[in-house]
Amino acid sequence: IERCAGINGDGTPLVEAFSNVDKVEIPDESTIDIYLKEADTEFLAYLTVAIVPEHVEDLEADPVGTGPFHYVSRSPQENIVLEKFSDYWDTENQAYLDKVTFRIVKDSNAVVTNLKSGTLDMYARLSSTQTAQLAEDSDFTIYDGGMNLVQALYLNNAVEPLNNVKVRQALCYAANRQEVLDMIADGKGTIIGSSMFPAFGKYYVPELSERYNQDIEKAKELLKEAGYPDGFELTITVPNNYQQHIDTAQVLVEQLKAIGVTAKIQQVEWDSWLSDVYADRKFQSTVVGVDAAYLTGRALLERFTSTSSKNFINYSNEEYDKLYQQVKTSTDEEEQVEIYKKMETLLCDDAANLYIEDMACEVALRSDFAGYRFYPLYVQDMAKIYKVK
């Protein structure tokens, strides 16, 4: 915890959420006292960080963890092999499988072939085409759930003409999100209206999904008021390793033509997206999905505060920042929930992004196995998978 907080080091926290830690004391062998600089009722959620020995030299080559499996080997761009850890601390939740191999499948067109040939026993995030190819195959069970991420056309609020709220609102009114779902996922998925998805339950505001129902005439009027009566050109940057996002961008390109916006897709490597779009913020718009690392409202909404290093869309709203500071120190759960809902509503009202959906997640599992589970966060819990034949 001290290392995560930067205590006894150079003061730089390894984990941003731990920057609030003032000191750590151990009064006895079964107790740890953590003192915070200011109240933070969500801090417990951030204690789910990995426990890693201080002097581990190469975590990439020799990972250290505390889970039900232990690391065996890794072949870059090929596979990662894990085996059951017999000394796992949670004796009531031991893994069923003795060995798990994660294979890298570079060609999405080869997924179904690999499943049917026996090379793969399981594959997550099937496309609608892949699901259709496996639907009648009794050798596989298809599990349906939410992907638990916020897919959107993320807009750089600091560049023209997207720095004009009316332009951003026009884009939102121009889109037909149900058509996006129908065309890329056979209608599966949940339309959303802000940076929150249904699995977060009490924080989620479902009515925001209807805030920008398609209205072409209203979109044109907003563009006219913003000074773009004839539309404008828009570049949509998309990482080339996510076919669902590419497909979504292609549908949006066609829809935006109705209001005079000429959009073009720029596909980039994932590393380039991380450096140029996410880190350097050199983009106009991008279609990606953003998920949460923790089960807190802050996990999805903190990134849009004006000073956050994760605020890659350059969103800036003084009221939003004030609400965030307020929710950080609130100790009343009901008040926290209401504040987070206000923050979601501001993102929607400001059309910070063109929110689309929490994408459907379909998982193929060979019928020899069972036990697959969906969680509010995107994880692959292999410890729950067991063999039935």
Map each language-model feature to its residues:
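Short, well-ordered beta-strand elements
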Residues: 32-34, 67-70, 79-81, 97-104, ...
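Surface-exposed binding/hinge segments that line
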Residues: 13-54
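Short helices/loops that flank or line small-molecule/ion binding pockets
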Residues: 109-119, 133-137, 166, 247-259, ...
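Alpha-helical secondary-structure segments
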Residues: 2, 29-31, 67-68, 96-99, ...
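Gly/Pro-rich hinge or "lid" segments in bacterial periplasmic/extracellular proteins
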Residues: 29, 42-99, 107-109, 217, ...
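Structural transition elements
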Residues: 190-225, 243-245
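Detector for C-terminal structural segments
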Residues: 174-202, 244-253, 274-389
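Ligand-site clamp/hinge motif
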Residues: 87-133, 262
